[in-house]
Amino acid sequence: VGSEMCIRDRFSPILMGLLVGFFWQILVMFGLHWALVPIALSNMTLVDGNGLLIGEVILTAMLGTTFAQTGACLGIMVKSKDAKLKRLCPPAIISGIAGVTEPAIYGITLPKKAPFFRTCAVAGIAGAVLCALGVKDYQMAGMGVFSYTMFISPDTKDIHPMIIGIVVSIICVIVAFVLELV
């Protein structure tokens, strides 16, 4: 499976980013996202002919999911007239920032259906953009705001991929927020 994921990444990183980004939250719902983590860890150990880490894109492609969920919860909190729903949003937003999307998924976006699929679309586009820009992760890190350090190559110490990840995250929050207000 790991070899298949590498082949897909080499064939079309944009398609790989789109698919992983879009389906990550659906995989989370069934607990199947954990099946991709060992593949990502294995891919992180691959080196090029010069002995430099080549990085991997599975965890890169899922970066937008937490921020899309966070933005959607912000939008729902602002737009909703339902007091109970408004009370559910702040804890889900805090969890989303920290990379835990289950409260947002199960408590807010999935029951409303459309916001869930909008966040999948935003995350898929974010994954495609990150992979198109050549952003890769090189080590394990937390999720959400704690994930940015995984984009710094231990070989080159280049922080540009991390900055791209931060910008894409902010855009995900804004786009998902606006989509809920429209």
Residue ranges and their predicted role:
Residues 21-33, 49, 95-98, 130-131:
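Transmembrane alpha-helix interface/packing and boundary motifs in multi-pass membrane proteins
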Residues 4, 9, 91, 103-182:
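Transmembrane alpha-helical segments and their short flanking loops
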Residues 22-26, 73-77, 104, 128, ...:
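Alpha-helical transmembrane segments of multipass membrane proteins
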Residues 29-36, 81, 135-139, 181:
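Transmembrane helix-loop junctions in multipass membrane proteins, especially transporters and channels
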Residues 8-19, 30, 49-58, 81, ...:
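Membrane-interfacial loop-to-helix junctions in multi-pass transporters
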Residues 3-4, 8-11, 15, 19-26, ...:
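Hydrophobic alpha-helical segments of integral membrane proteins
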Residues 35-39, 68-80, 170-182:
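Transmembrane alpha-helical segments in integral membrane proteins
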Residues 41-125:
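Helix-loop-helix junctions within the multi-pass membrane cores of secondary transporters/permeases
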